[in-house]
Every structure is written in C-alpha cells, then in structure tokens.
Amino acid sequence: MNPVINYDELLKKIPYKFAIPIAVAKRAENLKEFAHSYVETWDNNYVSIALKELSEGYIRIKNEEILKVLIPNVK
C-alpha cells in the first residue's frame, strides 16, 4: 500500500512552502549517504522517507525564526 503524504497538511505544520522541498532534499541526500532512518516506509525511496520523517516531526527545519519573515501577512 502506498501511503500518501498530503502536502497541504504538511503546510499546516510547517508554513514555509519553499523550505519544505529543500529540507526534504537535504535529508534524502543524508539518507543516501547512509544516515539512519527514523521511520519505516513501504519502499526505500529516500524522498518518501524524508517526507514522512518531516511530517511526523522526526526532523525539522533549522533556523525557522529566519523564515518567519517570508510568511505573507494577508488579510
């Protein structure tokens, strides 16, 4: 079974839509270089593992305070 990670739900937890792919790509690169995975997935796709780790809170975006200025203030 292919578990689907909902990007909109992930944006509710982490409101930085451009930082999420960068964080996932960096984590996938670390996994490719033999880093330890924090979650089990149905496949060995590094991007799927990194997305699941981010959505479950096992990894986080560093320096999140700096990114807060990027959130639009729309009324």
Swiss-Prot record:
Annotated Gene Ontology cellular component terms: DNA-directed RNA polymerase complex
The family database entries (Gene3D superfamilies) matched by this protein are listed as: 3.90.940.10
Taken from the record, one Pfam family name reads RNA_pol_Rpb6
What is a GO molecular function of this protein? DNA-directed RNA polymerase activity
Please give the catalytic activity noted in the UniProt record: RNA(n) + a ribonucleoside 5'-triphosphate = RNA(n+1) + diphosphate
**Keywords from the UniProt entry:** DNA-directed RNA polymerase, Nucleotidyltransferase, Transcription, Transferase
The enzyme's E.C. designation: 2.7.7.6
Per its UniProt entry, which superkingdom is the organism in?
A: Bacteria
Entries under SUPFAM superfamilies matching the protein: RPB6/omega subunit-like (SSF63562)
Role played: Promotes RNA polymerase assembly. Latches the N- and C-terminal regions of the beta' subunit thereby facilitating its interaction with the beta and alpha subunits.
- Could you say which protein family the record assigns here? Belongs to the RNA polymerase subunit omega family.
Which HAMAP family does this chain map to? RNApol_bact_RpoZ
Q: How does it assemble?
A: The RNAP catalytic core consists of 2 alpha, 1 beta, 1 beta' and 1 omega subunit. When a sigma factor is associated with the core the holoenzyme is formed, which can initiate transcription.
Please state what the protein is called: DNA-directed RNA polymerase subunit omega
